[in-house]
Amino acid sequence: MSLTFAQADVPSTPIHVIADGGVASWAAGQPDHVRTWIERLGFVGRPGSVAMLPGEDGNIVAALVGVGTEAQRARARFALAAAQPKLPEGVYHVAGDLRGLDPDEQALGWLLSRYRFGRYREVRSPGAGLKPPRGVDRARIEAIAAGEAMTRDLINTPAGDMGPEELELATGDLAREFGAGVESVSGDRLERDFPMIHAVGRAASDAPRLLDMRWGADGPALTLVGKGVCFDTGGLNVKPARGMGLMKKDMGGAATALGLARMIMALEPRLRLRVLVPAVENAISGRSMRPGDVLTSRKGLTVEINNTDAEGRLVMADALALADEERPELIVSMATLTGAARVAVGPDIAPFFATEPAVADAIRDGGAAVADPVWELPFHDPYETMIEPAIADLDNAPSGGFAGSITAALFLRRFVTSTSRYAHFDIYGWQNKAAPGRPAGGVGQGARALLAALPRLLGV
């Protein structure tokens, strides 16, 4: 769906942003009937509260939106967006100041609150529209919202309609829209050149493939690698029913990478962008890889399979090996890789790893600037021994259960040896409960933080 601002020439209703306790000073200059109405409503400016103000003729002439205390505003994401679903249909504009709130964040949150996933049923109207607040770069915020909407659509679509073939089609549509090139590697070539991607996906009726999209002719090179496991049964180490229900989101890394690519291409920075998506389904059949198998990767490293449900790092490893061969200025991988990451930081925060402090600092600062919370975890070298089994170079599922997100990241780092700057995001990709700007369902994580970091990381 299109998430855009209302046009400037459309009639609109003013919104007055009111801090908790600030309604009296605002109302002091208003007519008696307005002050009386606000009193009767009991509106004091609490977060997300709304008061519609009638004129003397009874028609709505303004809206008051509460954003809480300074402390509440400091810890809230998309504070203004909390009011969006509560307002009547129509177009609104912000009158006056935003009480210290960041205009870009509030404008984006409003657009994201209008997102609806309507592929399988008629959905309610996206509701109240907004003109961009003063100082907001309309084109940039709309580009970011469009990328996030794409990510959400891809994750929310069930695997029956978003398998490897459909993910390839979606990637092709994106490439055509922005004049990018895209190649799909499958069949015998995939088995020969990307053996671990092939091994993970060979049991499924929808053939595994590696998608390779390129955009931009000059500038620094950025390669994004997104995990595209379109459904994950766990393989022969089959998941319990409780663990399988949300596995349509196991391609959330690919969805996030493609959504970020959309943002980048729409904003047209001077860089060379490459997006690699290993697209597979981890299914069960007589062709499934087995616990105890040893696979040889594209890089030549051998991997002992101690759990077929740790398949994401296998497909990512072959794609990362390809990315590393080109030695771009920056490689970033995004994957719904481990449950351990959720245990560590919960569902809202995207943990990431970085090979250089400057990369970590830029991503951390970028996330803070755009309300996309991230948290650095360490590439802790002493844990390398945990991913080294007795009969192969690497173990895809170390026993013991300790430091699961770190050992998975260390596994991936083994395949990035020529590129000095590498960052890996271990995302969740799902909003369990609706929040301002974040309807329940698929959600992008880390993409906006990385986009905000690119000027520091690549000078674009």
Describe each PLM feature range.
Residues 1-228:
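Short amphipathic alpha-helical segment within the helicase RecA-like ATPase core
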Residues 168-460:
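A generic structural signal for tightly packed, nonpolar segments enriched in small/aliphatic residues
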